[in-house]
Every structure is written in structure tokens, then in C-alpha cells.
From Swiss-Prot:
Voltage-gated potassium channel that mediates transmembrane potassium transport in excitable membranes, primarily in the brain, but also in rodent heart. Mediates the major part of the dendritic A-type current I(SA) in brain neurons. This current is activated at membrane potentials that are below the threshold for action potentials. It comes from Mustela putorius furo. Residues 1-184, 250-256, 308-321, 404-630 are cytoplasmic. One of its GO terms (biological process) is protein homooligomerization. The lineage of its organism: Eukaryota, Metazoa, Chordata, Craniata, Vertebrata. Homotetramer or heterotetramer with KCND1 or KCND3. Associates with the regulatory subunits KCNIP2, KCNIP3 and KCNIP4. Interacts with the regulatory subunit KCNIP1; this interaction mediates the capture of both the N- and C-terminus of KCND2, preventing N-type inactivation and stabilizing the S6 conformation, thereby accelerating closed state inactivation and recovery. In vivo, probably exists as heteromeric complex containing variable proportions of KCND1, KCND2, KCND3, KCNIP1, KCNIP2, KCNIP3, KCNIP4, DPP6 and DPP10. Zn(2+) binds at residues 105, 111, 132-133. Keywords: Cell junction, Cell membrane, Cell projection, Ion channel, Ion transport, Membrane, Metal-binding, Phosphoprotein, Postsynaptic cell membrane, Potassium, Potassium channel, Potassium transport, Synapse, Transmembrane, Transmembrane helix, Transport, Voltage-gated channel, Zinc. Phosphorylation in response to MAPK activation is increased in stimulated dendrites. Interaction with KCNIP2 and DPP6 propomtes phosphorylation by PKA at Ser-552. Phosphorylation at Ser-552 has no effect on interaction with KCNIP3, but is required for the regulation of channel activity by KCNIP3. Phosphorylation at Ser-552 leads to KCND2 internalization. Phosphorylated by MAPK in response to signaling via the metabotropic glutamate receptor GRM5. Phosphorylation at Ser-616 is required for the down-regulation of neuronal A-type currents in response to signaling via GRM5. This is A-type voltage-gated potassium channel KCND2.
Amino acid sequence: MAAGVAAWLPFARAAAIGWMPVASGPMPAPPRQERKRTQDALIVLNVSGTRFQTWQDTLERYPDTLLGSSERDFFYHPETQQYFFDRDPDIFRHILNFYRTGKLHYPRHECISAYDEELAFFGLIPEIIGDCCYEEYKDRRRENAERLQDDADTDNTGESALPTMTARQRVWRAFENPHTSTMALVFYYVTGFFIAVSVIANVVETVPCGSSPGHIKELPCGERYAVAFFCLDTACVMIFTVEYLLRLAAAPSRYRFVRSVMSIIDVVAILPYYIGLVMTDNEDVSGAFVTLRVFRVFRIFKFSRHSQGLRILGYTLKSCASELGFLLFSLTMAIIIFATVMFYAEKGSSASKFTSIPAAFWYTIVTMTTLGYGDMVPKTIAGKIFGSICSLSGVLVIALPVPVIVSNFSRIYHQNQRADKRRAQKKARLARIRAAKTGSANAYMQSKRNGLLSNQLQSSEDEQAFVSKSGSSFETQHHHLLHCLEKTTNHEFVDEQVFEESCMEVATGNRPSSHSPSLSSQQGVTSTCCSRRHKKTFRIPNANVSGSHRGSVQELSTIQIRCVERTPLSNSRSSLNAKMEECVKLNCEQPYVTTAIISIPTPPVTTPEGDDRPESPEYSGGNIVRVSAL
């Protein structure tokens, strides 16, 4: 070991000064230190085809997670000796790095919902995300939650929910989303018009309109045309009252609606009118009445229901409540500090207007907000110095929260823009689907009128095949099975109605049809998948059938009917071979299935004939089993 180090020492010194000496002989092998890992093993993690390798000790650092516990054995494949996870390999890189470094990072280019799903799958909580990424993660998560909430509200007020809505829900939906119906849109514009009229009237009634007869002093328009303004105010208040009562009646939660900000604004907007009706016109209450009339200006906030920009501003102020609280707290501290300093700095001046600390509040507020009315100015040198410091500190204190408020406003604005775009795309997509359905139906009806469907059926065989395709699949399979049995056995299966018609033709002396009544001879029957078996003819006497067609029907010997929870029934030979009208009707109303075993007597010596139909007009001598549907 020492010899190896001594051999490497000249090369290490040469590398330290930037050059390498020429070796006279081959360099010795570097010293190796065997790494002993008795309990640690190399684990291969296959994530959707991407292989990751790490040590078992690395994963077991966090035993409360999926990879660090024994639960990962559920994903082990003995054939490949790998742990297979059908997850996103890009996000898994950051999860595996958490096991290696102990720090979890949030990839900015990944979807926040997919990232949360991966963390939940592997048993990691978002609170362990590093400080470098946690704030951005919270912002993205909040935006996603708001977007999902907007989508849920849109789906709840969508057109698809109209058939299941009650009248109360329809009214509330019309108020919240006026574009759902024509009447809601008309009421929306009517209320907006009366809000504008009310605000304009509240402003115009204070404008001087000249003096009335008998008065020298000019009167405001509200007093000179009191009747006109009263009627106008009454009409506006009636509209606002009806709107408020309808909203209150249709609100999903009346308690939450009454406590909402917009509900309070509506009450404050209409309450002064009703109080003014019951108040007497005297000097004692005139001051209170004037104070109540001031609250009519709050009607302008009703425009927030009609303006998306005002709603975005309200959402911005609500989301920036913490920043605004910090701004207010900082201004309050600065105002108190600088007002106290300015009072004591100007206390020695006789011409100073800083008579008290509360009186100095006005100067501090005006200075920190950079207004500078000039009604109060410092006279001493110390007062001017502290006034300059107060002005500079005001700029810094006010400017700090402004970027946060602007960024929140921009975020909420773009979020609403995306929501409007998604709603427009969804509406256009539904319109295209509706148009496609209508166009397809119209095209089908037009082609049917033009006879395009009938022209496709060029022959009777094609028409029969078309009818058979449109029939029941069960019936088609049933005929196919009987057809295969007819081909592979020496029996012919005849439809019950065809068999009775053939018997009636023979009984009346008419010449039966030349073709066989079996299913194989009928048109429209599909080809069988089984090969034909050589058929043999049996002649068996039948006492219950007329002599003209006695040899065409095989006699049934006995039938055993096994019923569920009943004793087996046996029918006689005569009843089995009786005519259809003499048979007892089957009871098909029972809830159980009846199993019937038909035994056919052993045929006598066979008389081989041709494989095809016989030349005689009678039916073939093959065994004909009459099949009925149970």
C-alpha cells in the first residue's frame, strides 16, 4: 500500500503545479478501497420505462413514505427484479432527489394538480417543500383552487342543470348569471339604468337652479323641483326593493345572503328613503335626515354587480388583506412617531401650529402621502429636518406593498380572462355538437326522402339479409344453432307454423310444396359452420297421423319433464303425438326453468336413400323433431 502511494506521489505533485512528468514505466494501479455493504443493496426503480437506481438505505431514511416502507414490495416484479411504478418519471426525479438530499423542490413547469397527485401517491406531504419553492407552490395551488371553484360554479349554473332546477334556483341563477335568459338580461339592464339614474339624481339635486318666487337666495334643484326628484327617487327605490326581495327569496342561504357585503349595500341604499317617509319635517330631525341622505351615495357600489373590473378590484383587495393590513399598521406607527417628534421639535416656536400631538397627525399624514397642502409647515430647523425624513419614509412605506397589490390584481384579472375564454370555448363546443346533431338528423331525413336508403337494397336477397341483420341477435344465433344441428345429425328441425301448414295441405289433398320444410331450405338462413352428415331415412308407423303423411313424422316415445322442487312428470305416448290443438297449453308463468328430456325409440332397419330431398311429393323420411319455444 505504501509503495503504491509513493509511486503516485510525483504525479500528484506535478498535477498540482499544472504539468505532468513523463513516466518511465507504466503507472501503477490506483489504490482501491473495498466498499462493504452488507445490509445495503442497490434498488432499481422503473417508473413508466425510465430506470432509476438508488441504495436501499437512501429510501429507508423516511420509513413513513411509500418507497421507504415495506409497501413498495407490492410493486416488485420478480422477473425483472425491479420495482415498477406507472407514474410520471419527470416528477419522480424530484421525489427521488428528496430521498437523496432531504430537500423537496417544486418544478415550475409541471402542473400543480399532477404534482399533488404524485406527492400523495408516494406518501409525501406538501409542507416539506423547501423554502425556495414553497411560496410559489402556495400561489399556484391557490390559483388552481380558485379556477376549479369557478369551473364548478359555471357547471352548476350551466344550461345542462336547467331541467332539474326549481323555480327558486332559476331565479337565483338569473340574478347571478343574467346571460342565461332574455328576461334576466332585460332585468339586468333595467336595474343598471336605474342605478345610474339614482346616482346622477343624487348629484344633480345639489346644483343651484335659481331662486323660486318669493325667495332671494338660490335654491338647489332638489328643493326647487322636489316633487320631480321625489318621484324619480321613489321609482328607483321601488326597483331596488323588488330586486332585494327577489334575491332574498331566491338565495340558497338567506343567512349568508343577509350577512354579505352586497346585501348590506342594498339595504343602506334603500333604507334612507323609507326612514324619510316616516320622519316629520321639523328642525329636530332635519339633521339626522340629512345624514341618512348621505347614505344614498352607496348606491354606486351596486355597479359592482354590473362591472367585471369592479369585481376584480374587490377580489384583489380581499386577497391582499394581509398586505393592506401591514401597510395600515406601518403608516400608523410612522404617523405616531413623526407626529410626536414634530410636536417637540416645534414646541419652542411661537408661530408654530403644532399645538398638540393629535394636531400634528394631520401634517404627518399629508407629508407621508406626499400631498403637501401647506396649511401646516415647520418653522424650526429641527422640524424641517424631521419633516424631510417623514416625507422620505412615507414614500418607502407606501411603495413597498404596491407591487404585491398590482401583481395580485394582474393575476386575478388574467384568471378571469381565462375563465371567460374557457366558458366561451365550452359554449362554442356545445353549439358545434348541437349543430352537428341537428345536421346529421336533417341529412338522414333528407336522404330517406330521396330514396337513398332504398336504392342500396338492389335485390330481394339483399333486402332479406338487411331485415335479418336488423332482427334480434338471439333469434339469429338460435337459427344458426338449429341449422348446425340439422347439418351434423340425421334430424330435420321444422318451424311449428310451417309444419302445421304442411300437414293441412296433405290432409286436404293439396299437393305440398316441392321444397323441404326444414330450416336449411328456408331463404335468409346463413350458412353453417359445420359439415353435413350423411342422412338416413327411417320408416316408423304412427297411429295418430293420417296415412298420407304417416311416414314423414317420427313418433315420440316418452318425455320426462323435470321441474325444480317437484316430482318428475311423464306424458303418455298418445298425448305426445297428438295434434297441436289437442295438446295442453304450457304454463309459462312459473319463475323456474323446466328441463325436458325427449326419448326417441330405436329405429328399425334403415332403407338408405339419397342424401338430397326425395323425388316423391311426400316429406322426407328423416326424423322430424317438432320444436316449441318454452
